[in-house]
Every structure is written in structure tokens, then in C-alpha cells.
């Protein structure tokens, strides 16, 4: 069934019911995995520019921007989604060069391309630009125009960065919204040990649509982390409830990387009260949300069969950390309406996937840099329906239900056959960015036990596995040579 998900986006459009109103548009949720700028100042060592081969650099930032824009161009005949909720933009740790007027910024650099800015025209001012400005400029260069930009107001802790003590300040990222609709208002809500929750209200042909972008505390199955996520969820729930108290039919989309499974209560029962399902109230009964008013939240993962619910991998299993939830107002005939059954995972085989299992092709700084993200984006369609009846509801053809399994899906490693896995050759190591994340059959001889290494085609390669039993098994083989 995955092929149906892929085909929808490779064609640049979804199979949709007949249009009911003037305009349809796409809302994309995209964790771009560490989109860091070119100033060389970074919370993560992997993104500090050291000059070493595997170091981050302006040239690798350019590759990363190019790959992000490639994904965005698969929408709307190359024009990009109308609304994008981004995760993992770097907080600007060189705040001496802010961009407060994006129109003025684009005008200033209209005679240069980002490719020139990050190469032959690179200077200290360009190095200091925040990533949202560089991405906006790249979009303009490629003809994806008309975006307004809002970012979270997360402040960099420069003293903690200088001290190198990441236990003091671990926040490296902020959230962002790029919108082709006018921005009416934005707020940035601080929440414990996580990125600020970004709230953006957009003017959709005269009607307000509020988008919340989240990136909660990591480690989905960890009880201590779940305690923090409960606080993250409370920040969001309280703010959403204040909006709904003023208008029970308010159109609200809640999106982002929640570092929780959509069925967190079933997958991790040891956590007790969960942030996503119990505090925030994410649930899978679409009909209940469609006929309700107020606080009900339908999680769009339930639009897909259970075997198609995946956005990321960990430990040989699929996860659903990327989420999109909607309020009852998006099922009425006033303002903005969800296009039923339009939710999909953005899988572009061979581009944002790797290997025979089509796992996410995560970003790597190896070689020239390559990959896209360790998360697949997720998308859904919406439409404007004018000043219709708030009491009238969308007729659901196949409403989502609470059919979630109690275990995560296996990615399918056990299904691979030998002829699906190529043999490793020394030539593969010469282009690590291209081959990072692929599966290979390795035939060689153990050349070192500590550190563990293998010789293939006359070249030595270090071996590592998170599986201690496998490491010990490899060390039990006799060293040759």
C-alpha cells in the first residue's frame, strides 16, 4: 500500500473529492534535520566548520538547501506547498546580522543566487544570515515565490555555548512557518526543555487559520522525558483552549515533531498518563471530532491504514513522531475545511529514501554532503468554504477510527533477500554521501580487534554496531594477517 502514498506526491497532487469552494491548498509538516547556517558557530560539534573532510561548510549547506527545495517542488506543479510548518532550523548564534524585513533582504540580494552567496560571494555578512533567510532566498531563486516567514523566538544562550556545557543549554533549534497566505499574528510560547511552540494565525481569504508548530522533548519511550512532554502538551492545550473558548468552531491545525507515537498510550503503556493522547487529547475517532465543537483533536495518522503509518525509524521499527491534528472547525462549512482523506506521507523513492526498504535518507556531512532528513514530511489538503453554515458538517466517506496497534511496525529487515543487498566494494567508500544508510553484504577478513576493523579489497574499515552481542561475535573471529 506504500506505493499509493508515493504516487500521490510524485504526480504533484492528491486524488481529491470535487472542490467545494474557491481554493484548495497544501499544509506540509517537515523536520529538515539540522538546517544550520554558515557562521561556523553551532551547539552541535558536527555542525562546526573545522575544515576537516566531514566538517559542515557553506558548500554542504548549499547541498542541504537544494535537497529541501527539491522536496518542496514536488507540490503544486513545482510552486511548493502554500503553508509549510518546519522543524529544526538552527537558532541564530550570531545574532548580529538579523533579517527583520525579508522583502528588503530579497531586494538586497536580487542580483545574486544562493549558490553564489555560499561560494564566490561568501562574506561575513552572508555567513551571519539565519537559515530561514537563506532558504527563502533559495526558494525565490527556484521560482517558489510569495512566502511570508515566521520563526520561533527561541533565544540563544551564548554564555552556555561559550562554556561548552550543554547541560546548561541544550536548545539548538527553532520552529518556523513559511506561508503564501498573509500572516495576521504570531506568538512564540516557551515550554520546558523543548523548542518554543510557534503559533501563527493566517488570513485564508478573509478567514483565520491558526497553525501551531511543535517540537517536543525527545526520547519517545523514556518516562522522565514523557514527564517533560506532559508539560509541553499542557502549554499547547491551554493555549488552544483559550482560542476555542472564544470560538468553538475555530480552525486550528496542530503540527510538528512531537517525539511521541500517534498511539503513544498503546505503544508505551509503562509511561502512564501520556502527553499526546491524555494531556493534549489526540485521538483517532474522526466522526467524533467531525460532529463535535470545541476541544476535540483528530490525529490525521488515522486517515491511513495502520501499515502505512510511518515517518521515521529507530531500532528497526517505524515511528510516527511527525504529527498533524485538527479541530472540529475544520469539518464545518465555514472558513477553512479539511479535504477528507487527503493526508499522506511524502515518500520520494530514491531521493528521500535509501535502500530496498525505502527508509528515510537522513542527512550526512560525509563527503560532499547528502541526504534529506531522518523524517519523512507529512502533508494534507484544505480548502476555503466561505461564510457557510458552522452547524453543517462534512459528510465522511470512510471515517478514521481508533484502530491503532499496540506495537510499532517492523521496517522489514527480516524480509530482505540476499539478491536485494549489493556487495560492498571499496568504490562505495569513495562517495560516502551517496551511499550512507544503504545496506551492503560485506566479505572480508578481520584486520583488528581493538578497534574492530575489517579489510575489504585491500582497504581497512572500522566496524561498529550498537548490538553488543554482534560486536562480541565479530571479535570471536580470528584476526587474519
Task: List PLM regions with ranges.
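A long, amphipathic alpha-helix that forms part
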Residues: 225-248
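Second-shell loop/turn segments in exported
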Residues: 50-61, 117-126, 162-165, 188, ...
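Structural recognition of the beta-strand scaffold that forms the well-ordered cores
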Residues: 26-29, 82-88, 148-151, 175-179, ...
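OB-fold nucleic-acid-binding modules
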Residues: 300, 389-481
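Beta-strand-turn-beta hairpins that frame and shape the catalytic cleft
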Residues: 22-27, 36, 181-185, 194-218
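Metal-dependent phosphoester-hydrolase catalytic domains
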Residues: 188-192, 242-252, 260-425
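Bacterial N-terminal signal peptides
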Residues: 7-17
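N-terminal, active-site-proximal structural segment of metallo-dependent hydrolase catalytic domains
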Residues: 20-172, 383-422, 455-458
Amino acid at each position: 500500500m506504500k506505493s499509493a502514498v508515493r504516487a500521490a506526491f510524485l504526480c504533484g497532487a492528491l486524488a481529491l473529492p470535487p472542490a467545494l469552494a474557491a481554493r484548495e491548498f497544501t499544509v506540509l509538516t517537515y523536520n529538515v534535520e539540522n538546517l544550520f547556517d554558515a557562521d561556523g558557530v553551532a551547539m552541535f560539534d558536527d555542525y562546526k566548520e573545522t575544515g576537516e573532510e566531514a566538517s559542515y561548510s557553506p558548500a554542504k549547506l548549499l547541498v542541504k538547501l537544494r535537497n529541501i527545495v527539491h522536496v518542496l517542488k514536488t507540490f503544486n506543479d513545482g510552486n511548493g506547498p502554500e503553508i509549510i510548518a518546519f522543524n529544526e532550523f538552527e537558532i541564530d548564534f550570531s545574532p548580529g546580522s538579523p533579517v527583520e524585513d525579508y522583502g528588503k533582504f530579497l531586494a538586497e540580494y536580487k542580483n545574486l543566487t544562493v549558490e553564489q552567496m555560499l561560494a564566490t560571494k561568501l562574506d561575513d555578512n552572508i555567513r551571519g544570515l539565519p537559515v530561514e533567510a537563506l532558504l527563502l532566498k533559495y526558494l525565490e531563486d527556484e521560482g517558489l515565490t510569495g512566502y511570508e516567514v515566521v520563526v520561533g523566538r527561541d533565544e540563544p544562550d551564548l554564555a552556555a555555548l561559550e562554556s561548552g556545557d550543554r547541560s546548561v543549554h541544550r536548545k539548538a533549534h527553532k520552529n518556523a512557518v513559511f506561508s503564501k497566505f498573509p500572516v495576521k499574528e504570531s506568538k512564540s510560547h516557551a515550554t520546558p526543555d523543548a523548542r518554543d511552540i510557534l503559533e501563527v494565525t493566517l488570513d485564508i481569504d478573509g478567514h483565520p487559520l491558526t497553525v501551531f508548530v511543535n517540537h517536543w522533548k525527545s526520547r519517545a519511550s523514556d518516562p522522565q522525558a514523557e514527564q517533560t512532554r506532559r508539560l509541553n502538551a499542557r502549554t499547547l492545550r491551554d493555549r488552544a483552549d483559550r482560542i476555542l473558548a472564544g470560538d468553538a468552531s475555530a480552525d486550528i491545525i496542530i503540527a510538528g515533531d512531537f517525539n511521541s507515537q500517534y498511539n503513544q498510550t498503546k505503544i508505551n503503556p509503562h509511561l502512564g498518563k501520556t502527553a499526546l493522547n491524555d494531556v493534549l487529547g489526540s485521538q483517532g475517532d474522526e466522526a467524533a471530532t467531525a460532529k463535535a465543537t470545541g476541544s476535540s483533536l483528530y490525529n490525521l495518522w488515522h486517515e491511513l491504514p495502520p501499515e502505512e503509518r510511518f515517518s521515521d525509524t529507530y531500532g528497526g521499527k517505524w515511528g510516527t513522531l511527525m504529527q498533524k491534528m485538527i479541530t472540529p472547525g475544520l469539518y464545518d462549512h465555514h472558513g477553512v475545511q479539511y479535504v477528507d482523506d487527503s493526508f499522506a506521507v511524502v515518500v520520494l523513492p530514491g531521493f528521500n529514501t535509501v535502500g530496498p526498504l525505502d527508509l528515510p535518507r537522513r542527512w550526512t556531512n560525509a563527503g560532499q554532503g547528502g541526504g534529506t532528513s531522518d523524517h519523512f514530511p507529512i502533508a494534507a489538503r484544505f480548502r476555503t468554504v466561505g461564510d457557510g453554515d458552522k452547524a453543517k458538517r462534512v459528510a465522511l466517506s470512510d471515517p478514521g477510527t481508533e484502530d491503532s496497534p499496540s506495537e510499532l511496525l517492523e521496517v522489514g529487515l527480516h524480509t530482505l533477500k540476499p539478491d536485494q543487498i549489493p556487495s560492498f566494494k571499496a568504490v562505495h567508500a569513495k562517495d560516502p554521501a551517496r551511499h550512507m544508510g544503504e545496506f551492503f553484504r560485506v566479505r572480508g577478513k578481520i584486520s583488528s580487534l581493538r578497534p574492530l576493523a575489517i579489510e575489504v579489497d585491500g582497504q581497512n574499515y572500522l566496524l561498529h554496531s550498537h548490538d553488543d552481542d554482534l560486536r562480541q561475535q565479530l571479535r570471536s573471529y580470528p584476526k587474519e594477517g
